Amino acid sequence: MGKFDEQKQIDSVNGALALRPQIEELIDRLLAEGVKNLCWLGIGGTWASCMQVVCYLKEHTDMDTFATNAAEYCTTGDKRVGAGTLVVLSSVTGTTTEIVDAVRLAQRHGAKVLGFIDKPDAELATLVDYCISYKGNEQLKFFMVADCFLRRQGNFPDYDTYYAQMDAYLAKDLV
């Protein structure tokens, strides 16, 4: 592991965890505005990350939550996406055609879009309603959104303890 940069990995995970207050504030605002369902939008590997968080949420909440493949959504649509929907996505480049097109379609149907976009100057970063730019740790960012919803619904009573432990130990324990 001659080229492995342990400190870089620790800093990366801790940086993602530091986004949590921003995520919590946004989720609080969206819940107050009446978000009723969650659409996790992806393509390729990001779609796989979406499916993981949906499986997790289905176990813990009765809130409608689903993963949608961006190309499929652009082709067939999804009647669940509309006013009251929060679409959550992640993009490294911010230029994937299917994701860009799906965001435009979801917004035309009244959905709000939260994008974790690695490049803050990418086209997609300007299209989404809420952009949080931070490189890497897609799954961690997705699960922080999910956990925040669970907490606000009363379905994650140990949230504060859990995240205190995540802040204290996760980054170091992963390396």
Language-model region placement:
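A short, flexible N-terminal coil/short beta segment enriched in small residues
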Residues: 15-50, 175
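Glycine-rich phosphate-binding loops that contact phosphosugars or nucleotide phosphates
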Residues: 33-169
